[in-house]
Structure formats: structure tokens, C-alpha cells
UniProtKB/Swiss-Prot annotation:
GO terms for cellular component: autophagosome membrane; endosome membrane; plasma membrane. Glycans are attached at N30. It comes from the Eukaryota. Induction: Is not markedly up- or down-regulated by DNA damage, nutrient deprivation or by exposure to TNF-alpha and IFN-gamma. Its main location: membrane. Modulator of macroautophagy that causes accumulation of autophagosomes under basal conditions and enhances autophagic flux. Represses cell death and promotes long-term clonogenic survival of cells grown in the absence of glucose in a macroautophagy-independent manner. May have some role in extracellular matrix engulfment or growth factor receptor recycling, both of which can modulate cell survival. The keyword Cell wall biogenesis/degradation does not apply. The chain crosses the membrane at residues 8-28, 52-72, 85-105, 117-137, 156-176, 186-206. Belongs to the DRAM/TMEM150 family. GO terms for biological process: autophagy. InterPro entries: DRAM/TMEM150_Autophagy_Mod, Frag1/DRAM/Sfk1. This is Modulator of macroautophagy TMEM150B. Highly expressed in the colon and lung with comparatively high levels also detectable in the lymph nodes, placenta, duodenum, peripheral blood mononuclear cells and spleen.
Length: 233
């Protein structure tokens, strides 16, 4: 039985993948990118209006969803007995990935290139590290794996391809092979969105989540007076 929490990763994957390709289609249609000169980076497609507005909205909402998914995943791993420090390391890696995604969307390359590249580093590199850490934890701790037996190997394959393509993207860009490097960037983005989408399988084991407010002890209300209840023996 799949609960509503399992829909969040699926929605994130569908939203982000369709959103960036819509931005690409608009950029090609209004000729802000010219395919005859080479295949563009995602950031180039989202640098010019009107698609830059859509690009920002897509990545901002995607970042918010990714952050919430990382928080839910943190609590799931905690309930599975994962210790605090590795769990928090995974959580903060995911949150920084979400932050980088928002930075990429709001600081376009043509306006704030250094800030944009810093956001891209957080989104791509730490996004990949986020899933590698979970794979390592799953391997060492023998954590539960909801879903089919091939989910784990599939994640391993996607993370491996993602790592190879990130390295290739950087090397090809340094060698001025921009079109091939851009193609690698697109594939990496799709793989990361797919990896987030696969968390739907893990969340299928969750029925719901509850937000609890924990006040400081000094601000807690005084305990209620004890009440004696008659007991008949």
C-alpha cells in the first residue's frame, strides 16, 4: 500500500524533468539558443526571459520538495536505527543539494556566474554524494530495502553513471568540447531527478508523518495536579 508520502518523490521527478525540458523548448522556439551552434547547457537555456522565470520557479519548487524529502528520509533512517552523526551527514548533504538547486535557478549564469557555479557544485556534486552515502550506509548496515530486489543495484548503477558523467562533463568543458559536456550535464540532471524519484519505493513503507512541537523545558506548562481515582477491588 503506497501512502501519500510516496507521491512526493514521483512528483518531484516529473515536475523537474518536464520543467527543464519545457524551458529548453521555449529557448529553442524563441531562438535564445541556437542548436546549429551546439547543444546548450541547461543554465544557458534558463538565462533569458521569459523562460528564465519558468526556470527559477521550477527549480525553487523542486528545491523545496527535495528538502522536505530529505527530512522525511532522515526520520525514516533514524527509525531504522541509523546513528545520529551519519544520518545528519546525509541530511545536510541533501539539504545543501536542495539549496544549490535554488541558487542555480535564481542566479542565472549570465548575471552571477560565480554564484551560479557554486550552486551547480552543490546541486550536482553533493546531490550525487547524497545518494552514494545512502548506498554505503545500506551496504554497511544492511538496512531494509522496500520494493523489488533490483532497486538497490539500480541505484548503484545510476550513481555510478552519474559520477562518471560528472567527471566527463568537467573534463570535456575544460577541453572546450562544450556540446558534449552540455549533453553530459543534461543526463546527470535527469539521473539525479530519477534517483530522487526512486525514493518513492522507500516511502511506500510509510503511512504518514506528524509534525511535533517540542518546547524548551523552561517554557513548558506546569504539570497538571494529580487526581485520585477511586479503585474498587
Amino acid at each position: 500500500m503506497w501512502g501519500y508520502l510516496s507521491l512526493m518523490p514521483v512528483f518531484l521527478a516529473v515536475w523537474a524533468i518536464s520543467g527543464v525540458w519545457i524551458v529548453f523548448a521555449i529557448a529553442v522556439t524563441n531562438r535564445t539558443v541556437d542548436l546549429s551552434k551546439g547543444f546548450p547547457y541547461i543554465s544557458i537555456c534558463g538565462s533569458f526571459p521569459p523562460q528564465s522565470c519558468i526556470f527559477s520557479q521550477v527549480l525553487n519548487m523542486g528545491a523545496a520538495l527535495a528538502a522536505w524529502i530529505c527530512i522525511v528520509r532522515y526520520h525514516q533512517l533514524r527509525d531504522w536505527g541509523v546513528r545520529r552523526w551519519p544520518n545528519q551527514l546525509i541530511l545536510w548533504t541533501g539539504l545543501l543539494c536542495a539549496l544549490g538547486t535554488s541558487v542555480v535557478g535564481n542566479f542565472q549564469e549570465k548575471n552571477q556566474r560565480p554564484t551560479h557555479l557554486a550552486g551547480a557544485f552543490l546541486a550536482f556534486i553533493l546531490g550525487n554524494v547524497y545518494f552514494w552515502l545512502q548506498l554505503l550506509l545500506w551496504r554497511l548496515k544492511r538496512l531494509p530495502q522496500p520494493g523489488a530486489a533490483w532497486i538497490g543495484p539500480l541505484r548503484l548503477g545510476l550513481c555510478s553513471v552519474c559520477t562518471i558523467l560528472i567527471v566527463a562533463m568537467i573534463v570535456l568543458h575544460a577541453c572546450s568540447l562544450r556540446s558534449v559536456s552540455a549533453a553530459c550535464e543534461w543526463v546527470v540532471a535527469m539521473l539525479l531527478f530519477a534517483l530522487f524519484g526512486l525514493l518513492a519505493v522507500d516511502f511506500s513503507a510509510l503511512e504518514s508523518c506528524t509534525l511535533c512541537v517540542q518546547p524548551w523545558p523552561s517554557l513548558s506548562p506546569p504539570p497538571a495536579s494529580p487526581i485520585s481515582l477511586p479503585v474498587q477491588l
